[in-house]
A protein has these predicted regions:
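A structural signal for multi-pass alpha-helical bundles of membrane permease subunits
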Residues: 1-170
């Protein structure tokens, strides 16, 4: 084990990449799924159902590789290259999936896209299960804005769902 940990360059690179990925993707996915759920929860039920399906659908798609391969294709037909070329941001297509500098951000984006659905659903169900009576009582007790509602009512009432969401992002 000592030789593997101390001398093996592949091990140290893999460990570094794993730590970077875990430190960025986990908390970002947790935060993003909560913010999106909080935003979507404000819509009327029919719109909320459509938006919930849109955010959950990527979790159901098993062929994420093919979808993202088309998006990040290295020619001018890839969605990202096509958009950046048409906006004049780049002058020639970027080979996204073979350039080391872009690979980790792309992997993080794909991971967020695929894993956010379950956390999003748990957060939106938690938001919908917070009793309206608690908000009314909070207004009587002096809560005056949405941030205070979030801090003193919503987040404490959602602790089990937030814990589940955090565990699912690991």
């Amino acid at each position: 084990y000592r030789r593997m940990i101390v001398e093996d360059a592949t091990f140290s690179t893999t460990l570094k990449n794993t730590l970077v990925f875990a430190i960025i993707a986990g908390p970002l996915g947790f935060l993003l799924s909560f913010v999106l759920a909080w935003f979507v929860n404000e819509f009327e039920p029919k719109v909320r159902a459509v938006l919930s399906f849109m955010f959950y659908a990527p979790s159901l798609v098993g062929n994420a590789y093919f979808i993202w391969k088309v998006a990040f294709s290295g020619d001018s037909y890839g969605y990202v290259n096509s958009l950046l070329l048409s906006l004049g941001i780049i002058t020639e297509p970027v080979i996204w999936l073979k350039t080391e500098a872009y690979l980790m951000p792309i992997v993080i984006i794909v991971q967020l896209w695929q894993s956010m659905g379950v956390s999003f659903l748990s957060n939106i169900s938690g938001l919908q299960n917070v009793s309206r009576d608690m908000y009314e009582a909070g207004a009587i007790d002096g809560i005056r804005n949405r941030w205070q509602e979030l801090r003193y009512i919503t987040l404490p009432a959602m602790q089990p769902m937030l814990l589940f969401s955090a565990v699912m992002q690991i």
